[in-house]
C-alpha cells in the first residue's frame, strides 16, 4: 500500500484522539499515513467543529505528498465529518468509513439533549426528532461511504446508523465505544478503504 494515501481519524462525543490511537496504529501498519484529529466535542456546535475539520482537510488536500485522503470517524465524529463536507468534497477525498454513526440521531441525545442544550449543544443536535440538526443535515455528495454498526449499542441503534447514500453496511459484534479497539473492525476499515466494500462474511443481510 503506497504511503501517499492518508487517513484522517475523527473521534466522537466525550472522547479524544487517544480513543482512536489503536485504530490509527493498525491503519499505519496497513501502509496508510494517519492524522488523528482532536476537538473539544462537548464545547461549541457541530457546525463549528465541521468548519475546523474542513480547514484541516483543505490544507491536506493542498499537500503534494497526499495523493488520496480517506476519512474514518466514530460516532458524532461522523456527523462532524459530514458537516465538513457540506460545502463540497475536496478533490483528493477518497472513501469514508463511519463507525457507529448517529446518522438518524441517538435516543439518549433525545432524552438528555433538551436538558443540556445550554451547556452542551452538540448533544441536542444529535436528537432523533425529525427537525434535529442531524436529521436535517444533507448527505455527502459523490462519496463512497461504508458504515460499521455495533451489534450491542445502547447509544446508537443499528437502525439509526444507516445513510441512504451508503455504499455498504455491516454489523459487527461489540459495543459502541469498544468497537474502535477491535482488530476485526480495523480489518473491515482497511478492506473498505482498499476495495470500496466490506468483507462478504460480515455484510448486512
Residue locations for each model-derived region?
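Helical cap/lid subdomain of alpha/beta-hydrolase-fold lipid enzymes
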Residues: 86-205
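Serine-dependent carboxylesterase/thioesterase catalytic core
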Residues: 2, 7-18, 22, 26-40, ...
Amino acid at each position: 500500500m503506497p504511503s501517499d494515501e492518508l487517513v484522517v481519524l475523527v473521534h466522537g462525543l466525550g472522547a479524544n484522539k487517544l480513543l482512536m490511537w489503536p485504530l490509527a496504529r493498525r491503519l499505519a501498519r496497513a501502509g496508510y499515513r494517519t492524522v488523528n484529529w482532536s476537538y473539544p466535542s462537548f464545547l461549541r456546535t457541530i457546525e463549528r467543529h465541521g468548519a475546523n475539520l474542513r480547514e484541516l482537510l483543505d490544507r491536506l488536500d493542498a499537500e503534494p505528498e497526499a495523493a488520496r485522503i480517506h476519512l474514518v470517524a466514530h460516532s458524532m465524529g461522523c456527523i462532524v465529518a459530514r458537516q465538513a463536507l457540506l460545502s463540497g468534497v475536496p478533490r483528493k477525498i477518497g472513501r469514508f468509513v463511519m463507525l457507529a454513526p448517529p446518522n438518524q440521531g441517538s435516543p439518549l441525545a433525545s432524552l438528555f439533549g433538551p436538558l443540556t442544550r445550554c451547556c452542551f449543544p452538540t448533544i441536542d443536535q444529535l436528537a432523533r426528532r425529525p427537525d434535529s440538526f442531524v436529521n436535517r443535515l444533507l448527505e455527502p455528495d459523490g462519496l463512497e461511504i461504508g458504515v460499521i454498526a455495533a451489534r450491542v449499542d445502547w447509544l446508537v441503534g443499528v437502525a439509526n446508523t444507516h445513510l441512504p447514500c451508503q455504499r455498504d453496511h455491516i454489523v459487527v459484534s461489540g459495543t459502541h465505544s469498544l468497537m474502535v479497539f477491535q482488530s476485526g473492525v480495523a480489518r473491515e476499515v482497511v478492506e473498505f478503504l482498499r476495495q470500496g466494500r466490506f468483507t462478504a462474511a460480515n455484510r448486512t443481510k
